[in-house]
């Protein structure tokens, strides 16, 4: 059995990424919940960075909610032009409209943009699915 960190060991600052983290199905959100819980129980500082739907995490785990067009939950043609305000949103929509796997790619771009100015805040950045070339 693994014990909590001893006094001579410093806790790690860990970022866990999930482009889609439903707390009820699909696996990624459930995996992030249990992994973050156990890492926190070991004494580490844990941040989960996720796109919608967002996971349900235990108290003490920080959640960074990165927005998206949530194209798996919405009808593609229900998206209003005013929602496609930036280059990233337009590319995400066009990719989905042409059969691309848009959501993981767009999440990777958003996660990279969020992480770059904060790299020194983390010792480990773990992308569970590594579907994002931006990471």
Residue ranges and their predicted role:
Residues 11, 38, 48-115:
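A conserved catalytic-core segment of Leloir-type glycosyltransferases
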Residues 32, 132-133:
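Catalytic nucleophile loop
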């Amino acid at each position: 059995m693994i014990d909590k960190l001893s006094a001579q060991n410093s806790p790690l600052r860990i970022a866990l990424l999930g482009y889609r983290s439903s707390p009820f199905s699909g696996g990624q959100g459930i995996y992030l919940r249990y992994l973050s819980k156990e890492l926190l129980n070991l004494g580490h500082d844990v941040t989960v960075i996720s796109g919608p739907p967002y996971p349900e995490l235990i108290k003490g785990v920080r959640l960074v909610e990165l927005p998206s067009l949530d194209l798996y939950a919405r009808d593609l043609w229900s998206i209003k032009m005013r929602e496609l305000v930036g280059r990233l949103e337009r590319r995400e929509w066009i990719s989905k409209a042409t059969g691309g796997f848009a959501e993981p790619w767009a999440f990777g771009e958003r996660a990279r943009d969020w992480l770059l100015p904060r790299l020194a805040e983390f010792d480990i950045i773990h992308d569970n699915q590594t579907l994002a070339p931006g990471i």
